[in-house]
């Protein structure tokens, strides 16, 4: 089958890889000159299935009000003048109760755990290298309340069979030695030993090279004007004066998917602006070993080979990509506070990207009401974590194979009234 994929970020390229491996004739189209040059370029670097959780959580509405008056707030909102933004925020608020949070987190963890398994298999099969580490991740708590709240997330981890360790502050240095000097500032941490890290852009670029060698065609520097359709079927992609045709079409345009699908399929994917710093390592003993997540500021600090990636925050501000100095100051503040000797902060590279977010936090993966249109978008801050699993899942569905995990509650149909997904089975695993 001829398949056209729109988008060459990590989700688009993994989709291309798995579809090609399934025997399809795949073409990837992107406006950029190469893969992973937008949202996948400089994310936080975490592959953290256990921390997969929606921003829509109990207490967030009240916290959002408090954050409006804080200098280093993890979430900021600025109206962009569109009804879509208001509708999206209302939908997000409706998902902030405990019941929705547990449901959404459960399916996010399910896909993320599966995705990590797919990444392991891909790494074993291809030998792909991307400055990856398999040292686990550590969520850091600064208050007793945060430590107590971790029990809520642990219930979801146990249900999914995800290994974890709940550590008091005096044990944090066992997994991240440099934290010994700042342990007095912390109340503890939640460690997920099976989580990983890696450079998402490097992974995507190298997988794109492998995919091209396997026969995937990449059409870079090719802006897409619109999808052409008749009835309930897509019959082409209009790119300037050219119409590119295929048997099936996959939308993986991230935050730009919503506008491209206007009048075809209604999806609630909105850009969630985030920032990162990439810092050269200055002191091996003072740098992170793997990756940590600061629960207070929602900022991740991740170790690559000779670099430290500091990423996080969320701004609901539309398609604004301005680099704001106060956001850089927040990233610098957190990394100086936890790893004061770790990196040459004065040499850091500052970056921003637009994460494609759904109001319930779960991506949109699978078929649509159109016979030959498929979606793989809306992964929010977890595109790197969920990419391989989403790509394999999409390939299985499109190819008519039975996927390894339940998937009906990942489709766009879940936003329809009366939708009732099948209950997912437990994932294998143990906890301690």
Curated annotation (Swiss-Prot):
Cofactor requirement: FAD
Reaction catalyzed: a D-alpha-amino acid + A + H2O = a 2-oxocarboxylate + AH2 + NH4(+)
Amino-acid positions noted as binding FAD in the UniProt annotation, renumbered to this chain: 3-17
EC number assigned by the record: 1.4.99.-
GO cellular component, one term: plasma membrane
GO MF, one annotated term: D-amino-acid dehydrogenase activity
Pathway(s) this gene product operates in, as recorded in its UniProt entry: Amino-acid degradation; D-alanine degradation; NH(3) and pyruvate from D-alanine: step 1/1
Record's function text: Oxidative deamination of D-amino acids.
Family matches, as Gene3D superfamilies: D-Amino Acid Oxidase, subunit A, domain 2, FAD/NAD(P)-binding domain
Entry's family note: Belongs to the DadA oxidoreductase family.
Keywords assigned: FAD, Flavoprotein, Oxidoreductase
GO BP term, pick one: D-alanine catabolic process
Pfam family, one: DAO
This protein's name: D-amino acid dehydrogenase
Originating gene: dadA
């Amino acid at each position: 089958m001829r398949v056209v994929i729109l988008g060459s970020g990590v989700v688009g390229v993994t989709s291309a890889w798995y579809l090609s491996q399934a025997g399809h004739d795949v073409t990837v189209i992107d406006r950029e000159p190469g893969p992973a040059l937008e949202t996948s370029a400089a994310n936080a670097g975490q592959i953290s299935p256990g921390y997969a959780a929606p921003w829509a959580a109990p207490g967030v509405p009240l916290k959002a009000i408090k954050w409006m008056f804080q200098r280093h707030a993890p979430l900021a909102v600025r109206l962009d003048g569109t009804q879509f933004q208001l509708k999206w925020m209302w939908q997000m608020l409706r998902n902030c109760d405990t019941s929705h949070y547990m449901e959404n987190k459960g399916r996010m963890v399910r896909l993320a755990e599966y995705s990590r398994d797919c990444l392991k298999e891909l790494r074993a099969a291809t030998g792909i290298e991307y400055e990856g580490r398999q040292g686990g991740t550590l969520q850091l708590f600064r208050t007793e309340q945060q430590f107590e709240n971790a029990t809520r997330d642990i219930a979801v981890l146990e249900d999914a069979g995800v290994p974890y360790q709940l550590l008091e502050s005096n044990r944090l240095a066992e997994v991240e030695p440099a934290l010994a000097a700042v342990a007095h500032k912390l109340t503890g941490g939640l460690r997920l030993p099976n989580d990983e890290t890696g450079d998402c852009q490097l992974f995507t670029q190298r997988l794109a090279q492998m995919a091209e060698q396997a026969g995937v065609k990449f059409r870079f520097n090719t802006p897409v004007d619109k999808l052409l359709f008749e009835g309930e079927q897509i019959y082409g992609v209009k790119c300037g004066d050219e119409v590119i045709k295929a048997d099936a079409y996959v939308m993986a345009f991230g935050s730009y998917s919503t506008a491209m699908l206007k009048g075809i399929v209604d999806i609630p994917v909105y850009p969630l602006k985030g920032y990162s710093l990439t810092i050269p390592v200055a002191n091996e003993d003072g740098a992170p070993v793997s990756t940590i997540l600061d629960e207070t500021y929602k900022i991740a600090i991740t170790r690559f080979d000779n670099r430290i990636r500091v990423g996080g925050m969320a701004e609901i501000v539309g398609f604004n990509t301005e680099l704001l100095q106060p956001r850089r100051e927040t990233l610098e503040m957190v990394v100086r506070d936890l790893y004061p000797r770790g990196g040459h902060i004065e040499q850091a590279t500052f970056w921003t990207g637009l994460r494609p977010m759904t109001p319930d936090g779960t991506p949109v993966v699978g078929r649509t009401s159109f016979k030959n249109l498929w979606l793989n978008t809306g992964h929010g801050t977890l595109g790197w974590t969920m990419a391989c699993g989403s790509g394999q899942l999409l390939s299985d569905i499109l190819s008519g194979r039975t996927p390894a995990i339940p998937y009906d509650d990942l489709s766009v149909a879940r936003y329809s009234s009366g939708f009732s997904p099948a209950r997912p089975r437990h994932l294998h695993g143990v906890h301690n």
